[in-house]
Amino acid sequence: MARSTGKDAQALFHSLRSAYAATPTTLKIIDLYVGFAVFTALIQVVYMAIVGSFPFNSFLSGVLSCVGTAVLAVCLRIQVNKDNKEFKDLPPERAFADFVLCNLVLHLVIMNFLG
């Protein structure tokens, strides 16, 4: 059996890229927000590994804030996606209001955790 992993990977990358090109701009913006939140969490973890985690509550609050915000944004993306049949009757304004309310609750809990 011939090994064509390079060609297969290139074909997979090309198909993913062409499928993502057809994604609406609103979903791409949400994806960018999720990527930024995860990137910020990774920066905090690297900083903690290099410098230390003396105020551990602050480090934990920052990372949980980033991860929680990313999870809520993924939920928003699922609800706003027009191809998703499960949330077809849910208007995008309602989904965004849910996102804002859940983000508010998340950050209130995180501020309470800080002390």
Curated annotation (Swiss-Prot):
Tell me the InterPro entries matching this sequence.
DAD/Ost2
Which of UniProt's keywords are assigned here?
Apoptosis, Endoplasmic reticulum, Membrane, Transmembrane, Transmembrane helix
Q: In which pathway does it act?
A: Protein modification; protein glycosylation
Locate the transmembrane regions by residue number. Answer: 32-52, 56-76, 95-115
Record's bilayer topology term: Multi-pass membrane protein
**What is the top-level taxon of the source organism?**
Eukaryota
Q: Where in the cell is it found?
A: Endoplasmic reticulum membrane
Q: Which residues form a coiled coil?
A: none
One GO biological process term is: protein N-linked glycosylation
Where are the Lumenal topological domains?
53-55
* GO cellular component, as recorded: oligosaccharyltransferase complex
Q: Which residues lie on this side of the membrane: Cytoplasmic?
A: 1-31, 77-94
Q: Which PANTHER family match?
A: DOLICHYL-DIPHOSPHOOLIGOSACCHARIDE--PROTEIN GLYCOSYLTRANSFERASE SUBUNIT DAD1 (PTHR10705:SF0)
Question: What does this gene product do?
Answer: Subunit of the oligosaccharyl transferase (OST) complex that catalyzes the initial transfer of a defined glycan (Glc(3)Man(9)GlcNAc(2) in eukaryotes) from the lipid carrier dolichol-pyrophosphate to an asparagine residue within an Asn-X-Ser/Thr consensus motif in nascent polypeptide chains, the first step in protein N-glycosylation. N-glycosylation occurs cotranslationally and the complex associates with the Sec61 complex at the channel-forming translocon complex that mediates protein translocation across the endoplasmic reticulum (ER). All subunits are required for a maximal enzyme activity.
How is this protein organized at the quaternary level? Component of the oligosaccharyltransferase (OST) complex.
Q: Which family does it belong to?
A: Belongs to the DAD/OST2 family.
- Protein name in the entry: Dolichyl-diphosphooligosaccharide--protein glycosyltransferase subunit DAD1
Source organism: Citrus unshiu
Name of the encoding gene: DAD1
